């Protein structure tokens, strides 16, 4: 799938937050994807025609970006193009939560990705949340499956172990690196990468499982190189971008279908 992605080089439109825009763009370029970053409402009709997929990230939400996201969903939905929603911090404020619900209720979102607190809040499971990180008491399988069922989406829940569900099946993906939680934008780039893989129009559940596995293996490879060179967060970030650009043989042993 990665080889096909790089051959096709899809154009992926990102309505993302200003904290991570450059990192997301560089990460997509490393993947072999052409990034397009725009939140100008007037551009949405034209950009929907030329882009292969859309990723919406509400990390720095405001009234203008809300209107832009709504218009973008309307345009991409009409063209039957994949849309990924990353409801960043939706468990932290009423504005984020209400906006996430409104975007999901548009029925244009094909994939919802977030952490346990974010997905948990959207399905009514109480989670303890601080900033963009989360701790939860409900089982991850319950949260991700319920999210997929409630919103008729592929649900992707990231963390130490990733979980992906279509509402019927749940698959878990292990591996990765603790450094992913120590850099800004890892989740935001993950959402954009989700949109990239979905642009290939393959089975969406399998596409998200493959993406999660690749992302974790790239992170593990970057951590290994960083530690070998006595590095930490900073060097991990650079090695991670390198790893995203390299061919990686997926380890299927890290993927498990849950009961």
Swiss-Prot record:
Substrate binds at residues 37, 185. Pathway: Cofactor biosynthesis; thiamine diphosphate biosynthesis; 4-methyl-5-(2-phosphoethyl)-thiazole from 5-(2-hydroxyethyl)-4-methylthiazole: step 1/1. InterPro entries: Hyethyz_kinase (IPR000417), Ribokinase-like (IPR029056). ATP binds at residues 113, 158. One of its GO terms (molecular function) is ATP binding. GO terms for biological process: thiamine biosynthetic process; thiamine diphosphate biosynthetic process. It catalyses: 5-(2-hydroxyethyl)-4-methylthiazole + ATP = 4-methyl-5-(2-phosphooxyethyl)-thiazole + ADP + H(+). Pfam families: HK. Keywords: ATP-binding, Kinase, Magnesium, Metal-binding, Nucleotide-binding, Thiamine biosynthesis, Transferase. Its EC number is 2.7.1.50. Its cofactor is Mg(2+). The keyword Magnesium applies. Belongs to the Thz kinase family. Catalyzes the phosphorylation of the hydroxyl group of 4-methyl-5-beta-hydroxyethylthiazole (THZ). This is Hydroxyethylthiazole kinase. It comes from Helicobacter pylori (strain J99 / ATCC 700824) (Campylobacter pylori J99). The gene is thiM.
């Amino acid at each position: 799938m990665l080889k096909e992605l790089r051959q096709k080089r899809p154009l992926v439109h990102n309505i993302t937050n200003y904290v991570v825009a450059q990192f997301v763009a560089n990460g997509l370029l490393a993947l072999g994807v052409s990034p397009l970053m725009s939140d100008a409402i007037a551009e949405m009709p034209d950009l929907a025609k030329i882009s292969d997929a859309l990723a919406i990230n509400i990390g720095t939400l405001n009234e203008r970006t809300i209107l832009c996201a709504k218009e973008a969903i309307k345009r991409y939905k009409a063209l039957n193009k994949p849309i990924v929603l990353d409801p960043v911090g939706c468990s932290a404020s009423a504005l984020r939560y209400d906006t996430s619900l409104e975007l999901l209720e548009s029925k244009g979102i094909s994939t919802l990705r977030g952490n346990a607190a974010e997905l948990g809040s959207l399905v009514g499971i109480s989670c303890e949340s601080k900033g963009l990180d989360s701790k939860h008491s409900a089982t991850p399988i319950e949260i991700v499956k319920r999210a997929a069922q409630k919103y008729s989406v592929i649900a992707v829940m990231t963390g130490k172990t990733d979980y992906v569900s279509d509402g019927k099946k749940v698959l878990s993906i292990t591996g990765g690196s603790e450094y992913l939680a120590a850099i800004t934008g890892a989740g935001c780039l993950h959402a954009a990468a989700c949109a990239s893989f979905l642009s290939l129009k393959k089975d969406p559940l399998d596409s998200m499982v493959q993406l999660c596995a690749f992302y974790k293996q790239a992170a593990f490879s970057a951590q290994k190189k960083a530690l070998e060179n006595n590095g930490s967060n900073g060097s991990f970030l650079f090695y991670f971008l390198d790893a995203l650009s390299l061919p990686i043989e997926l380890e299927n042993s890290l993927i498990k279908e849950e009961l």
